Amino acid sequence: MPDMGVFLLATQAVAPPGELLNLALNAGAIAPEGAVLVAMLATLLVDLAGEQAAARWVPPICYAGLGTALVLLAQQWNAPLEPSFLGAFLADNLAISFRAVVALSTLLSLLISWRYAEQSGTPIGEYAAILLAATLGAMLLCGSTDLVSVFVSLETLSVASYLLAGYMKRDARSSEAALKYLLVGSAAAAVFLYGASLLYGLSGTTSLQAIGLALLTSPTPLAALSLVFVLATVAFKIAAVPFHQWTPDVYEGSPTPVVAFLSVGSKAAGFALALRLLVGCFGAFDNQWKLLFTVLAVLSMTLGNVVALAQTSMKRMLAYSSIGQAGFVMIGLVCGTEDGFAAMVLYMAAYLFMNLGAFACIILFSIRTGSDRISDYAGLYQKDPLITLGLSLCLLSLGGIPPMLGFFGKIYLFFAGWADHQYLLVVVGLVTSVVSIYYYISVIKMMVVKEPKEASDVVKSYPSIKWSTIGMPPLRIALVGCVVVTAVGGILSNPLFQWANNAVAGTPLLQEAIALGSQRSIG
């Protein structure tokens, strides 16, 4: 049985010989996902008791489940690596980092969801359960090391995301967004399955490590074709150009808290998938997939930031902004160095807070005004200084203005790219960062510079606001927390980068890829 021999060879790097029982199960590796699953089931049971019981008990159940998951993830950090479920899942530091980003994005998305759901008349029990299901799929995807577990996790995330996008059934735009997302996502899933079938046919196994070993020993044109199919699926999940067409329409039509989760949690899972598949499986085609991702990164940074200039809707502007941000993260992926991977992890953590902070401000503004138009923010500083300050800081961080957290995230990415001689990516990144600063600053100027007589009609009729730190509602807690981390995180960038370096150092997959890349550069 040659495939079993390849399988054992692939798993010896992470599991001592003879520990086949741990290799077969080791269910403790998915204990954080178990906490999320228990919270999801409890949410569904509470929802059966009625809307009043759900409104009272669903939020604390979600907080408890996600909080427990984060604690369990912290306990797994730097723990001995033991593959789970016959090598289908591995809780290395890379998986822990991305799973933590996903869990935190869900927690913050829920904090900014309750008020929105209450005003729109959305049943929060069903909504929270579906969001937790998407979280479960995304977290499992971050640690999946087998084609079967990758596909099951990917579809769990995708199906839950389709339901979330169309959750506002009375809104035609939400239904349209869900339909578009479903059609494009189904096509991406079919393409992935075709690529996975080619990989299985070429290697005789579904283990990603074993597939990587098989392709290293005998690369074939069919393997290159499977690379194209897999890369298309990854590009769809991270909304890279030219696989981005669904993003603006889905972001505009979906409920805003759902967009917040899709822009961070789903994207983080997509980049974790990219690392597992491209670095783990296609080491034999390292130059080819890096060239393709270089093209995707240049297109994403350019189109995402240029088209965002013309947007009049805040959600559409942030949709195109997220496409550009994905291009920045791809710089670290293309580098394939320790600094590149670490900068990639750091920027995803920074993006979590600055993007969700911006969405928290947008949701609070839309709840009070019912508007999403950028022009309606004119003169907002007169009526709501906190939203103005919070949104301004988050947008400045997204643009890479010092001393915000986003500035240091981009600097680390650009330094890693320059050190790896990725001059084209760095130059395009710098130019498009300047372009992004223009449309971010234009929103800030709209809010701050306008005279009282030039304020929009929406702001003129803005309700009076009384801020108090005592008994702050969840939406304001999320807003203040994200803004504080975004503003102060730049000061703590060195410890954060050390954490990101530890994530890379504790991941054998990335260390092997770095060593292989060094050998090729020397040779």
UniProtKB/Swiss-Prot annotation:
One Gene Ontology term, aspect cellular component: plasma membrane-derived thylakoid membrane
One MF term in the entry's GO annotations: NADH dehydrogenase (ubiquinone) activity
Catalysed transformations (reactions): a plastoquinone + NADH + (n+1) H(+)(in) = a plastoquinol + NAD(+) + n H(+)(out); a plastoquinone + NADPH + (n+1) H(+)(in) = a plastoquinol + NADP(+) + n H(+)(out)
Coiled-coil annotated residue ranges, if any: none
Pfam families registered for this protein in UniProt: Proton_antipo_M (PF00361)
Subcellular localization: Cellular thylakoid membrane
Enzyme class of the recorded protein, top EC level: translocase
Record-listed E.C. numbers: 7.1.1.-
InterPro entries for the chain: NADH-Q_OxRdtase_suN/2, ND/Mrp_TM
Protein name, per record: NAD(P)H-quinone oxidoreductase subunit 2
